[in-house]
Regions:
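Pre-Walker A (pre-P-loop) alpha-helix and adjacent loop at the N terminus of AAA/AAA+ ATPase modules
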Residues: 88-130
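Short glycine-rich substrate-engagement loop in P-loop NTPases that contacts/grips substrate
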Residues: 108-117, 148-189, 199-206
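Walker A/P-loop nucleotide-binding motif
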Residues: 124-144
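Residue-level preference for the first positions of well-ordered beta-strands
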Residues: 127-131, 158, 189, 221
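Walker B catalytic acidic pair
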Residues: 194-195
Length: 280
């Protein structure tokens, strides 16, 4: 055991020389590249403990190499974390491509989405959500996805889903319904896409209210995208819709999306490409 301890101490207190290293006038080992010491003397009381007068020191070359290793490891851990957040946070892999970097810059509401991310801590503290409303294909879901991706790149958990999937999960899951909803509400930001497209059964409306009401009570922000108009939301058809819309409007600031239908444009481009391929 004593020999093993001595071997450990020997490794701890010995600097490993490289061929270009040299011994300086002070008797210490120096790096042959940066000319900085790779050893330092122990204080007298420490020298007595270790049974030798010197210990390894970090030269500039070693420091740079260590910092590069640490930075690479930090980047790897960050990428792993972001990958896991996106795996859990998105219900559709294509949402990973909904980023500000991939944006065509034509949506006038892009600035609002960017500022939401920039001021996320204030949005979170003050529980400020957004209601992206407007016509089909105007970029509501895309910009909501941009917000989700940008926050997850900052290692902030976000979940983006829709009520059709939520209702399917609730119907198929063996998990306690309240626990499922509580899990949704644990995310710092919840994004509900295509609100209003789910089936309007009594059961469905009750679960929609439960999710939105639970989110309201959690005190955490919510972003919703919908093709419904503000007039639809302010003039619900019945009491069941009224209490849902009331909760929603109390949590989310309405942001109107107008302009071109990007989906129609994309479909038109595909059609033109196909015609060109066929006629060439």
């Amino acid at each position: 055991m004593k020999n093993e301890i001595n071997a450990v101490l020997e490794n701890m207190t010995n600097a490993t020389p490289e061929p270009e290293d040299y011994t300086g006038e002070d008797g210490l080992l120096y790096c042959g590249r940066c000319r900085k010491p790779k050893e330092a003397y122990f204080a007298p009381d420490k020298a007595a403990i270790f049974g030798r007068d010197r210990h390894p020191a970090e030269c500039d070359c070693q420091r740079v190499a260590r910092e590069e290793r640490e930075a690479a490891e930090k980047r790897r851990r960050h990428l792993d974390t972001v990958e896991e957040l996106k795996r859990r946070g998105f219900t559709d892999p294509t949402m990973r491509d909904w980023t500000f970097e991939n944006d065509n810059g034509r949506n006038p509401q892009t600035g609002i989405a960017r500022r939401y991310v920039e001021h996320w801590e204030d949005m979170r503290t003050d529980n400020i959500g957004c209601l992206f409303w407007g016509g089909v294909g105007t970029g509501k879901s895309y910009l909501a996805g941009c917000i989700a991706n940008a926050l997850m790149e900052k290692e902030i958990p976000v979940h983006m889903t829709n009520f059709a999937l939520i209702l399917n999960d609730l119907a198929a899951s063996f998990e306690n319904r309240n626990e499922y909803i509580s899990r949704l509400c644990r995310y710092p930001l919840l994004i509900l896409d295509d609100f209003g497209m789910e089936r309007g059964t009594e059961y469905g409306l009750e679960q929609v209210f439960n999710v939105i009401d639970s989110r309201y009570r959690s005190g955490k922000p919510l972003i919703v995208t919908t093709n419904l108009t503000l007039d639809d939301l302010h003039n619900p058809e019945d009491t069941a819709h009224s209490r849902i819309y009331d909760r929603l409007l109390s949590m989310c600031v309405p942001v109107r999306f107008t302009g071109d239908n990007f989906r129609q444009e994309a479909a038109q481009r595909k059609m033109e490409s196909m015609k060109k391929l066929i006629t060439d």
